[in-house]
């Protein structure tokens, strides 16, 4: 629900606005960031996490988000605990890719994860950065 241009989460019964402390929260399978005033962060980022117009975490890349959602749908289910889902994501990454020598990232580089994850999803092979990037985005989505 939007009030005065700020997004708030309405409880499942539809009668009250849920209150959350400042910080990251998992709500209905999505990750959200709540600001000091109780509203949800939208169309912005906090440190390394980006949130869309609905306040939900996104990689910022629709293609990558689609790959991640498809992979998670293939290896997890709603009956799993968070730990089981994380293990399933790890096994998915381990079992759905092959090693391919690729150029190393420059020391101190922080922008490698997105490109590496996309490469891994698209080619089903990559170096350690590709495996790590793919797992990173899958884990964040959980």
PLM feature segments, named:
Residues 41, 121-122:
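Generic, ordered loop/turn and secondary-structure boundary motif
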Residues 1-67:
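Extracellular adhesion/carbohydrate-binding repeat motifs centered on closely spaced tryptophans
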Residues 63-120:
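Secondary-structure boundary elements
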Residues 8-9, 32-33, 90-92, 99, ...:
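Aromatic side chains
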Residues 37, 54, 80, 84-87, ...:
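Polybasic, low-complexity, intrinsically disordered segments
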Residues 89, 123-142:
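Cysteine-centered nucleophilic/redox motifs
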């Amino acid at each position: 629900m939007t009030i005065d241009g700020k997004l708030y989460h309405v409880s499942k019964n539809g009668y009250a606005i849920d209150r959350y402390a400042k910080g990251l929260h998992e709500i209905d399978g999505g990750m959200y960031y709540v600001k000091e005033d109780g509203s949800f962060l939208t169309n912005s980022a906090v440190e390394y996490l980006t949130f869309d117009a609905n306040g939900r975490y996104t990689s910022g890349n629709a293609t990558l988000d689609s790959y991640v959602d498809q992979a998670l749908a293939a290896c997890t289910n709603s009956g799993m605990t968070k730990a089981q889902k994380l293990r399933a994501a790890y096994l998915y990454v381990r079992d759905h890719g092959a090693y391919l020598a690729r150029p190393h990232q420059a020391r101190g580089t922080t922008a490698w994860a997105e490109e590496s994850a996309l490469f891994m999803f698209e080619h089903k092979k990559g170096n350690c950065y590709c495996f790590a990037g793919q797992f990173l985005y899958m884990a964040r989505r959980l």
